Amino acid sequence: KFTGVVLGLSGGIDSALTLAIAVDALGSERVEAVMMPFEYTSELSMNAASKQAKNLGVAYKVIPINGIYSSLMSALKPEFSGLQPDVSEQNLQARARGVLLMGISNKKGLLVLTTGNKSEIAVGYSTLYGDMAGGFNALKDVSKTLVYKLARYRNCNSIEQDIEVIPQEVID
């Protein structure tokens, strides 16, 4: 039995809209957001995720994936030896995040929300057992263009107009 939801909050538009939908549907007390930065995660993304979580009053934590990624790369070093870096290394980042979210889900009884939109899913811009790992996707039938429109709409229709539900810098 799930008592709430957890999602990876990247500081991007898709996870930001998913978080807003989850809070609208369940209330902030039943939603957890996790930022899982890697060495290339921008300060802008970190700040946007933190700001939105605070604005919406959800439980928020930061779990860096650098150590997990390094361990995976060490374990795979014999297999990757002599091969050029490619999308495989990027997919390991997504899969590390998926493992962390599933661990939180199992331990706390929270449903993992995935955040990919219909456009990304249609063209295969996602990672199996990574950002696709979860129990429900609120944006599964929402195109990327509509994601932006919904984000703007949600911000314009906030009960508390002085609080951005989705940080404007994420929409821009």
PLM features per residue range, with description:
Residues 30-31, 35, 43-88, 94, ...:
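A conserved beta-strand->alpha-helix junction
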Residues 13-17, 40-44, 62, 68-72, ...:
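Flexible loop/turn segments at secondary-structure boundaries
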Residues 5-9, 13-50:
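ATP-dependent adenylation/pyrophosphate-handling site
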Residues 1-6, 100-104:
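Phosphate/ATP-binding catalytic cores across multiple sugar-kinase/actin-like superfamilies
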Residues 26, 56, 79-160:
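Active-site adenylate/phosphate-handling loop in enzymes that bind or generate adenylated species
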Residues 21-22, 47-49, 76-77, 126-130:
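Short, glycine/charged-enriched secondary-structure capping and boundary segments
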Residues 3-9, 111-114:
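Short glycine-rich phosphate-binding loop at a beta-alpha junction
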Residues 2-6, 161-168:
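Flexible, glycine/charged-enriched surface loops at secondary-structure junctions
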